[in-house]
């Protein structure tokens, strides 16, 4: 994920052909990315942090949207598996950053490995 400026409402970015902009941002709590129309997804995805107690925080990722056009075919076959792998990597990175280790690291399926090679690693 690359943004054209520091994280703030209005920052534009994405990864590969998936494009979005920051539509809502609460520093340290929540960020919502709304998909650009040309992406073929009408909707948004959001990351949020919920403090559970002094020792635990829940990281939540929610994807709300509807695919249209060619994305209807691409989503299940290509986008969803790559997206899930990226989110799992993000959660692993957050765990590593906060605890110094990852108890159960995510692994990429053979399908994700092939798709990453075909899409240039995005």
Predicted regions, residues:
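Glycine-rich portal/gate segments that line the openings of hydrophobic small-molecule binding cavities
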Residues: 1-44, 93-108, 120-121
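Beta-strand/loop substructures that line and gate deep hydrophobic ligand-binding cavities in soluble
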Residues: 37-89, 105-107
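Short terminal or interdomain "cap/linker" segment that borders an active site or interface and mediates
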Residues: 112-122
């Amino acid at each position: 994920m690359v943004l054209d400026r520091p994280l703030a409402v209005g920052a534009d970015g994405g990864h590969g052909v998936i494009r979005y902009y920051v539509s809502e941002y609460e520093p340290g709590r929540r960020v919502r990315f709304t998909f650009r129309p040309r992406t073929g997804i009408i909707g948004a995805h959001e990351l949020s942090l919920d403090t559970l107690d002094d020792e635990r925080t829940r990281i939540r990722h929610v994807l709300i949207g509807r695919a249209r056009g060619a994305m209807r075919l691409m989503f299940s076959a290509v986008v969803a598996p790559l997206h899930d792998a990226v989110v799992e990597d993000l959660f692993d990175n957050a765990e590593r950053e906060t605890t110094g280790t990852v108890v159960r690291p995510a692994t990429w399926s053979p399908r994700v490995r092939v798709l990453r090679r075909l899409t240039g690693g995005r």
